[in-house]
Swiss-Prot record:
This is Adenine phosphoribosyltransferase. Its EC number is 2.4.2.7. InterPro entries: Ade_phspho_trans, PRibTrfase_dom, PRTase-like, UPRTase/APRTase. NCBIfam families: PRK02304.1-5. It catalyses: AMP + diphosphate = 5-phospho-alpha-D-ribose 1-diphosphate + adenine. Pathway: Purine metabolism; AMP biosynthesis via salvage pathway; AMP from adenine: step 1/1. Catalyzes a salvage reaction resulting in the formation of AMP, that is energically less costly than de novo synthesis. Its main location: cytoplasm. The keyword Methyltransferase does not apply.
Length: 184
């Protein structure tokens, strides 16, 4: 397990900033799910900068940052700009023109699939860090890893803003190295 004690806003650890600016929404998108709304975090200039700085320390030296749609892509784009790398958005099914590579997965509240372009990118041998907002069951990170490995990319790890430890997603995607900025 990778722990970070990164500071922002004076000396507050980034995990405290994330926790203070995350809104819990009960029964969304369906009953029994506790949704982590990171909108207040992303809208706060200083907190978002602290998150990106922490992720930049983790992803330094990577060739490409891959963000999982939609909130993971938002974070990945900011991170790629900070690192001076390219960014790849791993999209929800049906959002890209063909041909695409598709990977199916199960998530906390149903099955889904994700896609990347099949022929417009050369990823073979490139080091890629996957970025997502929340690690829950590990379904999306696992699928993203499988999808990128099919292209020949070298997935160096993943980083998430929030990890929901009770759902044991980290165990589901082992041995993928996962960095969490905060845990709930």
């Amino acid at each position: 397990m990778t722990d970070l004690v990164v500071t922002g806003r004076g000396s507050a650890p980034v995990a405290d900033l994330i926790s203070s600016l995350t809104r819990d929404v009960a029964d969304f998108p369906k009953p029994g799910i506790q949704f982590k709304d990171l909108t207040p975090l992303f809208a706060d200039r200083e907190a978002m900068a602290a998150v990106i700085d922490a992720l930049a320390d983790i992803a330094a030296g990577t060739d490409l940052v891959a963000g999982i749609e939609s909130r993971g892509s938002l974070v990945a784009a900011a991170l790629a700009a900070r690192l001076g790398t390219g960014v790849l958005s791993i999209r929800k099914s049906g959002k890209l023109p063909p041909p695409v590579l598709t990977e199916e997965y199960d998530r906390e509240y149903g099955a889904a699939s994700m896609e990347i372009p099949a022929d417009s990118l050369e990823l073979r041998g490139r080091s890629v860090m996957i970025i997502d907002d929340v690690l829950a069951t590990g379904g999306t990170l696992g699928a993203a890893t499988r999808l990128l490995k099919r292209t020949g990319a070298r997935v160096t790890g993943a980083a998430v803003v929030v990890e929901l430890t009770a759902l044991r997603g980290r165990e589901a995607i082992a041995p993928l190295r996962v960095h969490s900025l905060s845990r709930a």
